[in-house]
Amino acid sequence: ETIGILNILLGSEWNISLRPIFKASMELLNVPAEKQDELLGQVEEFFTLRLKNIFLDREVPHHVIDLLLSNNELSVADAEGLVNALLANRIDENVELVQAYTRMYNLVKDVEYTGVNSDLLKEDAEKVLFEAATKASEASSAAWEAGDYDAVVAVPATLVPAINKFFEDVM
């Protein structure tokens, strides 16, 4: 039945979160409040694994599936839209993009994000990267709100020149 529900959602235009439905079902079934969070996690994990199997049957690469399904806030429709956009654009095969983001990840992987104080940016390349990242964030948010998954997937590539310039000039 789970795969049937997921297939209905994948084939529809419905972009809904299943979490409120799961919570309402637990209330109707009189699940004790102290057990609801644990049960909710188990049900969501069960649905996520079934969705993963559907994507694997469609030969979506494991790393693409793992990336998407690591965000438990995604609806089935969002996951489907992003899978299609990622497969159409294959940003994971863009060597320059992967290298730039790997360098950035290695720089910040042990840092806890607390925000950016733009007054501390001294080098032009830092300022350019911050401005580009701010615009990219806005573009990504607007594309996400519009349901334009291709545009969401295209945003990271727009930062590559600023990332590369940052590493050339600052690092």
Describe the function of each predicted region:
Residues 1-171:
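Amphipathic alpha-helical "coupling" segments that flank catalytic cores
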